[in-house]
């Protein structure tokens, strides 16, 4: 694979979202070949990458992070070393766990509001200036729901994968996460209905 083509001292920057344990195993294998391995999952989507505004959550030792950072600045505005190997992936799991719950909660709230007779504009005007506001309200409701124009940018299958990574991580530290488990079940139902 890739390692057979790497010279000692090469840094592999893995920008996928995987379990921290997987990253730590890959880093150990890379180290056996004299190669550094840094996890660097992102938030901000395709548009963020095109505009160079991604948030990049890095897991690596300080020296590796500092060497790789200038390359990441081409696509990222906020490039942070979260901790050692796997910690970027851990942060991404926590972030996407919260994102998934926020998106599911917003969808549920808007359907309830509509069934109670509220229109989208009124709900947006109130929620966006009240305690229910969030990134999801600002970014998703304004962009997709208000203009009644939905263009998918993040597949439900990917969100589901991220939620299952959170479930796996929680089991690993023996922590129940019942809200996330319920949210994961909602995404699983949607996938089963063909909305992957």
What is each stretch, according to the model?
Residues 2-7:
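Short, conserved loop/helix-junction motifs that constitute active-site signature segments
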Residues 8-12, 17-100:
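Rossmann-fold dinucleotide-binding core
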Residues 51-59, 80, 84-116, 127-140, ...:
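Active-site-proximal catalytic alpha-helix in oxidoreductases
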Residues 71, 121-129, 181-185:
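Beta-strand segments within the central parallel beta-sheet cores of soluble alpha/beta enzyme folds
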Residues 85, 135-195:
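Interdomain hinge/lid region at the active-site interface
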């Amino acid at each position: 694979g890739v390692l057979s083509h790497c010279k000692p001292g090469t840094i592999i920057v893995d920008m996928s979202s995987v379990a921290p344990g997987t990253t730590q195993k890959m880093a150990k294998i890379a180290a056996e070949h004299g190669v550094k391995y840094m996890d660097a999952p992102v938030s901000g989507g395709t548009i963020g990458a095109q505009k160079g505004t991604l948030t990049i959550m890095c897991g690596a030792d300080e020296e590796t992070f500092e060497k790789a950072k200038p390359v990441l600045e081409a696509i990222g505005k906020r490039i942070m070393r979260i901790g050692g190997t796997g910690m970027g992936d851990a942060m991404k799991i926590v972030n996407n766990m919260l994102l998934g719950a926020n998106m599911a909660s917003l969808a549920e709230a808007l359907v309830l509001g509509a069934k109670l007779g509220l229109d989208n504009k009124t709900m947006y005007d109130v929620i966006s200036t009240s305690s229910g506001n969030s990134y999801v309200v600002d970014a998703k409701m304004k962009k997709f729901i208000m203009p009644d124009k939905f263009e998918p940018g993040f597949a439900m299958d990917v969100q589901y994968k991220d939620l299952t990574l959170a479930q796996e991580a929680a089991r690993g530290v023996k922590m129940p996460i019942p809200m996330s488990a319920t949210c994961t079940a909602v995404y699983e139902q949607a996938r089963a209905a063909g909305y992957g």
